[in-house]
Amino acid sequence: MHTAPSDTEPVSRTAPPSGSASRAGRALAQIAAALVVTLLLLVVVRLPWAGDLGMHAATIQRLRHSLLHPGNPLVDADTPSPYYSPWMLLLGVVAKSTSLSVFVVLRLAALAGLGLLVTGVWRYVRTLSAHRAAPAPALLSLLLLWGPLLFNWSGFLGLNSLALTVAYPSVFAFGLAFHFWAWLTRAVRGRTAWGVWLGLGALWALILLCHQFTGVVASLGGLAMVLAARPAREALLRLGAGLLLGLLVLWLWPYYDFFALFSAGADLEAIHRPLYQDLAGRFGLVLLGVAALGFRWHRDHRDPLVLFFCLGALVFAAGGLSGHYSWGRALPAALVPAQLAAALEVVSAGRGAVRRVWACVLPAALAVGAWTQAGTLGYVVERGALPGVVAEKYRTPWVGYQWMVRAGVRYGDVVMARTFPARQIPAYGAYTVAPGYPDVFLRDAGRREAAVERYFADGTGAQERRAILREYGVRWVVGGDPAPWLREVTVGPGGQTLYRVLP
């Protein structure tokens, strides 16, 4: 007869501490985890920009000017946007009520997201192991156990990736996901009040609204935990009520149609295809976790991490086989359980010899992962102060376009710019003619992109260029050739010329 564990009983058994070497190893892991978290806190101060940070800054810009009708974050158009999530709405309220710059608000968001992530990992790991030392190696595995090739992508928790995305909604959502899994794991193990299940449903919807791809990962993890626990019928009924409430929240969210996103995947496949490339180089160290999952499966065929991994791997593989490459964003649903399993195997019950071998192999793998991501130090230490071999791994962040604001570009001005500048300019309040990122709700995105291409094309005549500028109400142009209707205002980094459009 199977007896469900109590609310505080971990899923897996743990080994008792054994000697000074074991204590030293635990202390070393805790110190290393503390140092990594400290490094990330210092990164928040610098807040390096090399990705989608401008998209989120632009979202806060629109919300601080109009909480009810913010419009498109990137272009001057009245469209909904999936970036207007409850979390970004709260940040918009903070920006509007305090007059803080959007980049200060993003630093506050980074602190909140990092805090949620660290505490969420601790809480969830405690549902898997009662060993006091378990959370520290688990956090290190999530950040360092990746591969010999550097990989940065929103929604993936590698150290260097997290340093560049710590202010993103994906980190906030991932932190909520770990808390969601911890809360759900305890709920399915015993008698839980209706209010708890309804709260879980609302939290599930919040994660999906804040970052849809991380919401998929959270959903797969939640499903794995329910399947592993085999809850009683009463618990399933309450779970169903929570799901219905979550769906209701998704349906009622006024800033965008959540369910319309299911038909928008075709526009995202090309940019997600790289997720299926260089898998061994990017994620090779995770194979250690796959081996650990094998041990866990041998001990318990319904182990939640094993089920979680299988669901994530299934969705990822289905995306690659069917050409739905955006499904690759579900890969963390396979990576996270494998990384956690690798860490937990060090403290799991079992033969002492196996555990001791694992305690040697895991630190070695973490050291390889740390070396791959050593360039993260460059985000808090000047490159010249780094050892040469570390400095070579550092990737210089983007400069930004603050210089345009100093030159006179104001909130709401429309700027003609190519794709790369268009990914940053809206962060300062201006619009661009075409969005720098795919926008599933902007119906004329293709037409706008074609207009930008025509404007900067060598064979386009003066009359057509002027017509494009008039059509989109352009007041500024970045780059391109001088013209009689343009007045050069300043030259920014990299020789980028800013022109004012003359009447």
Labelled PLM ranges:
Residues 52, 203-307, 324-330:
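Transmembrane catalytic cores of multi-pass membrane glycosyltransferases
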